[in-house]
Amino acid sequence: MAQITAAQVKELRDRTQVGMMDAKKALVAADGDMDKAIDVLREKGLAKAAKKSGNIAAEGLAEIAVNGNTAAIIEVNSETDFVASNDQFKDYVNNVAAAIAANKPADLEAAKATKMSDGQTVDEGAIALTTVIGEKISLRRFQVVEKTDNEHFGKYLHNGGQIAALTVIEGADDDTAKDVAMHVAAINPEYLDRTKVPAEELKHQTDIFTEETKNEGKPEKIVPRIVEGRVNKWLGEISLVDQEFVKDPDQTVAKYVAAKGGKVKGFVRYEVGEGIEKKQENFADEVMDQIKG
């Protein structure tokens, strides 16, 4: 049996808002596996949803550049938010985005070898900036997105580039595409529509809702109907086109765009530092180590 630590209990409580004993019991039942512990709590009806782990170390900026029917969305990391607000850093990020949109590199290695308008490669520019600023600067990721002449790009940067959202809308106009990009930045949908949800994930969620409903003591014959309703509600919450439009919750994103004569074709959303785990320092252990030393 895995040893359950106070830090694990705290993380689970932070992510699910359950009590300490419920969190500890779930971790014990899941043998220390955080995701399984969340499922245990959800099946018992103790946690309706779980926040994603918020441990983020990297600072930096996300940016979007458009070059005709090609757009590039990028993330460049620095070590502190102070550097992220530096004008030289901002200029570099803009130059990188423009170079990637113009050259459409196939992967990160090719992107770092891409030449910018000043003649330096993306990697050379990062090294030069690192020397000047004194912090490691690096291109973390990018995506190149293409559209047709009948489609529109929508781009939106939140908080100066902490979040970047790029959309592709068929028909409609640039303003509609930007409105949807703003929605994507704010609501953070997981998929374009229900058909994009992986079958494995759909089954996993259906199983959880089934156990949750049974544990509520619902009559067996109505369990499938209740589960179907909960699955549909969940799908509507994670699918962009089915979400309530952030600027007009009385209609879905799909209906808003359709009213403008368009259809949502795709989106990309970057949030600076997402998915990067921050090292958690245990200062009590650090003090004990110093005492023992």
From Swiss-Prot:
Gene3D superfamilies: 1.10.286.20, DNA helicase RuvA subunit, C-terminal domain, Elongation factor Ts, dimerisation domain. Residues 80-83 are annotated as: Involved in Mg(2+) ion dislocation from EF-Tu. It is found in: Cytoplasm. The gene is tsf. Belongs to the EF-Ts family. It comes from the Bacteria. Transmembrane segments: none annotated. It comes from Lacticaseibacillus paracasei (strain ATCC 334 / BCRC 17002 / CCUG 31169 / CIP 107868 / KCTC 3260 / NRRL B-441) (Lactobacillus paracasei). Associates with the EF-Tu.GDP complex and induces the exchange of GDP to GTP. It remains bound to the aminoacyl-tRNA.EF-Tu.GTP complex up to the GTP hydrolysis stage on the ribosome. CDD domains: UBA_EF-Ts. GO terms for molecular function: translation elongation factor activity. This is Elongation factor Ts. GO terms for cellular component: cytoplasm. It holds the Pfam family EF_TS. PROSITE patterns: EF_TS_1, EF_TS_2. Keywords: Cytoplasm, Elongation factor, Protein biosynthesis.
